[in-house]
Design a protein with these regions (language model features):
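Solvent-exposed loop/linker segments at secondary-structure transitions
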Residues: 104, 121, 131
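Catalytic or ion-translocation cores adjacent to nucleophile or general acid/base/metal-coordination motifs
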Residues: 5, 9-37, 132-158
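C-terminal catalytic subdomain
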Residues: 125-254
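A general structural signal for short secondary-structure junctions and capping/turn motifs
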Residues: 14-20, 65-68, 104-106, 112-115, ...
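Primary mode marks residue(s) on the alpha4-beta5-alpha5 output face of response regulator receiver
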Residues: 10, 16-104
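Conserved phosphate/anionic-ligand binding catalytic regions in large, soluble enzymes, centered on
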Residues: 111-126
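Single conserved hydrophobic/aromatic residue that forms the stacking wall/gate
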Residues: 1-8, 12, 260-264
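Active-site-adjacent structural elements in folded domains
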Residues: 105-110, 189-193
Length: 266
């Protein structure tokens, strides 16, 4: 009985400690830096530059590790400034220190308007059109115009502005610097993973904002085209009539069944 009481007392003390905001905190954060798995092309480039032992390794869990990291130059780290015991001057390293509401706004800006919706559009159309690299898709005038319209034309009128980062400049960097980066070997197949879990957030929030603002989302054309592209992708046949493997998705069976049903109806 004494042991049980002692254990219960310890648990209570720990709970009190964790719940005391003057003692400990759990700041919210948002990080944005595209970092795909290590690519053989990057390893080869490093070898040509005289750097040895750069070969990526596939682990027993099918994850990829390497002595190098594929990472882009632009990076954003936004942290809720709630540290009751003090903190380093993270601002000097380029970290945005702000309040919780602003962290959420930055996340919403990125996920619903300025980056993720563009990525998903390129992912589904990239698979259908036979692309292996996201960067190469930006050489296609129609795909490039599609993502510009999604982000800059349709997204900006209802974008969440966090104040600490300018949405238009952020989106412009995404479109003109980050996505076209030829040294960022990201694939449409990777980004197409779990699309059923993403569509509602990446496009639905903008659609809802238009309805709330104008009473209708009929002004949108690029966003519906991106969603239609996902439905086309779910058929699993590219534009050369060749079958391709769909990326992993927890609702793949349901999504594919519905898409095939609707395709037969039309």
């Amino acid at each position: 009985t004494h042991c049980i009481s002692s254990a219960a007392s310890d648990v209570y003390k720990r709970q009190q400690y964790v719940n005391d905001e003057n003692t400990i905190s759990f700041p919210w954060s948002m990080i944005d830096k595209i970092t795909p798995r290590p690519a053989d092309t990057v390893a080869e480039s490093l070898k040509e530059a005289g750097v040895e032992d750069m070969d990526p390794v596939i682990t027993s869990k099918r994850t990829y590790i390497a002595p190098f990291v594929n990472a882009e130059g632009p990076q954003y780290l936004v942290i809720e400034d709630r540290f009751p015991n003090g903190r380093p001057q993270l601002e000097k390293a380029g970290v945005y220190m702000t309040d919780r509401d602003t962290v959420n706004k930055v996340e919403r800006m990125k996920v619903t308007t300025c980056l993720n919706p563009l990525h998903t559009a390129l992912a589904v159309y990239g698979c259908v059109l036979g692309y292996d690299l996201i960067a190469d898709e930006m050489k296609d005038k129609e795909l490039s115009e599609l993502v510009k319209r999604i982000g800059l034309v349709e997204g900006m009128p209802v974008v969440t502005n966090p104040g600490i980062i300018d949405p238009e400049k952020f989106a412009d960097e995404v479109i003109n610097v980050r996505i076209p980066n030829p040294f960022m070997p990201d694939t449409p197949q990777r980004i197409a993973t779990d699309t059923s879990q993403k569509v509602g957030i990446r496009y639905g929030e903008t659609i809802k904002s238009y309805v709330a603002k104008d009473g209708s989302a009929r002004a949108l054309t690029a966003i519906p085209l991106a969603i239609a592209g996902w439905c086309r992708y779910l058929l699993g046949i590219d534009d050369n009539s060749e079958a391709f493997e769909l990326s992993p998705d927890p609702m793949a069976d349901e999504s594919v069944s519905y898409t095939h049903l609707r395709a037969h109806e039309t």
